[in-house]
């Protein structure tokens, strides 16, 4: 029996399962207590129980396997991992571990890990010889992440516009710069759907920091991938802990030569959370940002890279501007030159209800010639030459109308020739 499967079951099903196993007094129990009772009954029968999670090592040397469904929040159903197991398998925070577990004995509060079956979806003996993420050689993105699905839907127009204006590669470090209400969250959702559809081999994580709860639900229902969130009613320490767990997990997967994509909404809110958490250094920049506060969010964003030894970590993060807060502008200025791809969104275009509201002239990818063939590059440069003299609103409107008339970008380029 698997602990993770039990967590996903609705409460009425758990109650029915408990009653079928003749467990008494389950009528008005909490979901947690139900799972405990079921697993204890299973263990008494001598059956094996399995569980999995992402390891968080605490300062005392032991660790816990946190659940992605609970956005890595500490809970009573976490699985205890002993210091001897951590040393034996050279485990680090962020390792995804699955294995055999046992229920708590008298006086214990947590399930404990008995035997490790998998580390980062790989055999445990393979995990010991991995190169550390910090020792990898970073390169420019070279393999393209094509977003176009080619079904002619309105959502696909966003993906096709990004493919034309600022193509994304595996290992890209991209910034989506947007004023409020310009459609940045919808754009991230479209990107997530495209990656889930076109690149199922990529491990997709959507990280929502300081967002509205209903947007988290909508994202979780529409995206094929892991949606991790810390809503605006959570404390800043929680935002920071979630972000640290996600980036550590991503690094461990890249060490196993996986391609990981993180979509972060938004890096501004994450930087604000770090600003609240970091101890005061006495040096304060404009807008109330502590001089040391941006070090850790920069480390998060800077982890995105294409790795020569195999694997890649792509991070696309949204940055807020024109919010009326001086702090947000300072945070954006600090991150401005750090990415190798930028998409600028324009409120004026969004107010005219043209989506995606992209300012084409200001958006682009560095070294885009590595991502595409010479013929496609020439076509894109010709398109930019046509759009450049226009006002940004007229340029986006022109491109939007042309894309709406065709199903794919190849078709669009053919129609341009004619």
Swiss-Prot record:
Q: What is its EC number?
A: 3.6.4.-
The UniProt entry, under Gene3D superfamilies, shows: 1.10.720.10, Nucleic acid-binding proteins, P-loop containing nucleotide triphosphate hydrolases
User: Where along this sequence does the record place binding of ATP?
Assistant: 169-174, 181-186, 212
Q: Which residues form the Rho RNA-BD domain?
A: 48-123
Gene Ontology terms: cellular component: cytosol
Which Gene Ontology terms cover its molecular function? Answer: ATP binding; ATP hydrolysis activity; ATP-dependent activity, acting on RNA; helicase activity; RNA binding
Q: Keywords of this protein's UniProt record, alphabetized?
A: ATP-binding, Helicase, Hydrolase, Nucleotide-binding, RNA-binding, Transcription, Transcription regulation, Transcription termination
Supply the enzyme class, top level. hydrolase
Domain of life assignment: Bacteria
Biological process per Gene Ontology, one example term: DNA-templated transcription termination
Looking up SMART domains in the UniProt record yields: AAA, CSP, Rho_N
User: Can you tell me where the transmembrane regions are?
Assistant: none
Q: How does it assemble?
A: Homohexamer. The homohexamer assembles into an open ring structure.
Q: What does this protein do?
A: Facilitates transcription termination by a mechanism that involves Rho binding to the nascent RNA, activation of Rho's RNA-dependent ATPase activity, and release of the mRNA from the DNA template.
Q: Which family does it belong to?
A: Belongs to the Rho family.
**HAMAP family, alphabetized:** Rho
Q: What is this protein called?
A: Transcription termination factor Rho
Q: From which source organism is this entry? A: Allochromatium vinosum (strain ATCC 17899 / DSM 180 / NBRC 103801 / NCIMB 10441 / D)
């Amino acid at each position: 029996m698997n602990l993770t499967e039990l967590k996903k079951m609705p409460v009425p099903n758990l109650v029915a399962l408990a009653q079928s196993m003749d467990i008494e007094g389950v009528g008005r129990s909490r979901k947690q207590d139900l799972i405990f009772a079921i697993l204890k009954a299973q263990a008494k029968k001598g059956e094996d129980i399995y569980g999995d999670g992402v390891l968080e090592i605490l300062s005392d040397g032991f660790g816990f396997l946190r659940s992605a469904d609970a956005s890595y929040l500490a809970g009573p159903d976490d699985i205890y991992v002993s210091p001897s197991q951590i040393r034996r398998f050279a485990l680090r925070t962020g390792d995804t571990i699955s294995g055999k577990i046992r229920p708590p004995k008298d006086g214990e509060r947590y399930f404990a890990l008995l035997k490790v079956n998998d580390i980062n979806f790989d055999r445990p003996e393979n995990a010991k010889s991995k190169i550390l993420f910090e020792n990898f050689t970073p390169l420019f993105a070279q393999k393209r992440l094509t977003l176009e699905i080619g079904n002619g839907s309105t959502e696909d127009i966003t993906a096709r516009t990004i493919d034309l204006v600022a193509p994304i590669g595996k290992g890209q470090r991209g910034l989506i710069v947007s004023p409020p209400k310009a459609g940045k969250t919808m754009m991230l959702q479209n990107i997530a759907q495209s990656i889930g559809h076109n690149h199922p081999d990529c491990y997709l994580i959507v990280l929502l920091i300081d967002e509205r709860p209903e947007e988290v639900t909508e994202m979780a229902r529409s995206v094929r991938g892991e949606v991790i969130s810390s809503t605006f009613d959570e404390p800043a320490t929680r935002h920071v802990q979630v972000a640290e767990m996600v980036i550590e997990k991503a690094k461990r997967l890249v060490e196993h030569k996986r391609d990981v994509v993180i979509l972060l909404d938004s890096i501004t809110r994450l930087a604000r959370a770090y600003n609240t958490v970091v101890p005061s250094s006495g040096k304060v920049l404009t807008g109330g940002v502590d001089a040391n506060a941006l070090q850790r969010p920069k480390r998060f964003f800077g982890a995105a890279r294409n790795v020569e030894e195999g694997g890649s970590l792509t991070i696309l993060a949204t940055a807020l501007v024109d919010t009326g807060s001086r702090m947000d502008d300072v945070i954006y200025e600090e991150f401005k030159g750090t990415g190798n791809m930028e998409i600028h969104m324009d409120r004026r275009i969004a107010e005219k209800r043209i989506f995606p509201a992209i300012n084409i002239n200001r958006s682009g990818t560095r070294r885009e010639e590595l991502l595409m063939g010479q013929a496609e590059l020439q076509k894109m440069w010709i398109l930019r030459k046509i759009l450049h003299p226009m006002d940004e609103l007229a340029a986006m409107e022109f491109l939007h109308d042309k894309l709406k008339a065709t199903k794919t970008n190849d078709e669009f380029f053919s129609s341009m020739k004619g």
